[in-house]
C-alpha cells in the first residue's frame, strides 16, 4: 500500500512539473505584456507585475493593423478547416461503407503520407503555386492543405465504431447513401467532427513557415508573420508590446481548445477502439 502511494505521489509530482513547464511560456508571455519596458529588463524574475499596465495593448490596437491580420488568418483558417473536415468525413465514409477495388491499397498509401517529411513537399508545392499564379495570395496558402490524411484516418476509425445493424436498418427503410451519411452517421459523429475541426483550425491559425514562403505583401500577412515583422521592425527591443501582440494572437486557439478539449480527447480515444 505504501509503495502504491509513493508511486502515485511520484506520478503526481511528475505531472505537476510537466504542467508547469508547458504553462510557464504562456504565463511569461502574459506577464511581459502587462509590464512597461523598465520592468521587462529588471534583473528579478517577477511573473506578477505590479502595477500592471495595459498601455501595450492600447499601443497595439492603435498603431498595429491587427484587425486586418486577424481577418487574413481567420479567412484562411476557416476555409482550410471546412475543406479538411468535409473531405475527411466523405473519404472516411467511402473507406468504411463502400467496397471498391484497391480500397485497402489506397488507404495504406494515404497512411504512408504521414511518414513523408513536410520539408520534402515544400519545393514541389511552391513551384506548383508559382505556375498557378497563386504566390502572394491567400489561395496559395490554402490549396496544399485542403485535405488531411490524419483527419480521414480519425473519421474512419470513428465511423467503424457505429453499429452495422443501425445502418442496415436505414438502408432497408429505403435511405440513399447520402441520407445514411447525413441523417444517421453525422448526428453520431458530430463531436468527433467538431474535435478535428478545432485541431485543423488551430493548426492553420498557427501556421508560419508555409505562409512565410507564399505571402510577401504586408496587407496579406497572417498573424504569426505579422508578429515576426513587428519584432523585426522594432529591432527586438519592444518586448512588452511584442508579447501583447503574441497574447492577442494566441487567444482564439487557446479559448477554442479550452472549450472543446473534452471532444478532442474523446475523438483520439475512440480512434483506438477499432483497428
Protein language model regions, located:
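A structural signal for multi-pass alpha-helical bundles of membrane permease subunits
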Residues: 2-275
Amino acid at each position: 500500500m505504501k509503495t502504491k502511494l509513493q508511486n502515485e505521489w511520484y506520478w503526481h509530482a511528475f505531472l505537476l512539473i510537466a504542467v508547469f513547464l508547458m504553462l510557464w511560456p504562456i504565463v511569461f508571455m502574459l506577464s511581459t505584456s502587462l509590464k512597461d519596458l523598465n520592468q521587462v529588463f529588471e534583473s528579478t524574475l517577477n511573473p506578477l507585475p505590479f502595477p500592471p499596465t495595459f498601455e501595450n495593448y492600447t499601443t497595439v490596437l492603435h498603431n498595429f493593423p491587427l484587425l486586418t491580420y486577424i481577418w487574413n488568418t481567420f479567412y484562411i483558417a476557416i476555409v482550410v478547416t471546412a475543406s479538411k473536415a468535409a473531405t475527411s468525413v466523405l473519404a472516411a465514409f467511402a473507406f468504411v461503407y463502400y467496397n471498391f477495388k484497391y480500397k485497402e491499397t489506397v488507404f495504406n498509401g494515404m497512411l504512408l503520407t504521414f511518414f513523408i517529411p513536410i520539408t520534402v513537399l515544400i519545393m514541389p508545392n511552391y513551384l506548383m503555386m508559382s505556375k498557378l499564379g497563386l504566390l502572394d495570395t491567400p489561395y496559395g496558402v490554402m490549396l496544399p492543405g485542403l485535405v488531411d490524411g490524419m483527419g480521414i484516418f480519425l473519421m474512419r476509425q470513428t465511423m467503424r465504431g457505429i453499429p452495422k445493424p443501425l445502418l442496415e436498418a436505414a438502408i432497408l427503410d429505403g435511405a440513399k447513401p447520402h441520407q445514411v451519411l447525413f441523417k444517421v452517421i453525422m448526428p453520431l459523429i458530430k463531436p468527433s467532427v467538431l474535435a478535428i475541426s478545432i485541431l485543423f483550425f488551430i493548426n492553420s491559425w498557427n501556421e508560419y513557415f508555409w505562409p512565410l514562403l507564399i505571402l510577401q505583401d504586408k496587407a496579406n500577412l497572417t498573424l504569426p508573420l505579422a508578429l515576426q515583422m513587428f519584432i523585426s521592425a522594432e529591432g527586438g527591443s519592444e518586448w512588452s508590446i511584442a508579447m501583447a501582440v503574441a497574447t492577442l494572437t494566441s487567444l482564439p486557439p487557446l479559448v477554442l481548445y479550452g472549450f472543446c478539449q473534452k471532444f478532442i480527447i474523446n475523438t483520439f480515444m475512440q480512434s483506438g477502439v477499432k483497428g
